[in-house]
Amino acid sequence: MAIQIRFERLDEDGKIALHSPFHPALPAAAKARGGTWDKRGECWVFDSRDEEAVRAIARSIFGTDGSDAPRLVTVQHRVTGADASLQALWFGGRQVAHRSVRDAAVRLGAGTVITSGDFPGSGGSSHYPQLRGAGTVLEVRDVPVSLVVVDDDTWIVSADEKPSSPSPLAGVSDEDLAAELTRRGWTVTR
């Protein structure tokens, strides 16, 4: 499950737009960089001179700024006591578990499965639902490796050895590629 991030240059006054999924850390970071929410366009709008800083924000939250195919890993995360007291758990740039109301079952995000333990049928209060289920181990797939901090409660279980998006030149032989570059005036050396 690759997170879709896109930047767009707007015609008006040298602005850029960041199109991304919701993440609770993004509004404060965007506002701190002078961003404003465009309700109609469903995007954050920034001064184009801040593009590199805004891309850095996207990379820190989502693991990519949309210009690359980040290396993805599968991670297991043990729900901590602090996690269990939350209504929603965000990990790897996305929501991985959420309890909408006290007596609702916990819903897992895309690419997330329980490998051990479980969440109880209810948790928290009517005004403050909680996940509960401390000690439950979640497997979260397709996490950008740059977002993983390995510790006692989080560990990598497998790595994607290939980029998440194949190169458009993957099917072209080295000889054909060298011939085409030479035809275009490039000097090719090995």
Give the location of each predicted region:
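Accessory DNA-engaging acidic/polar modules
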Residues: 1-190
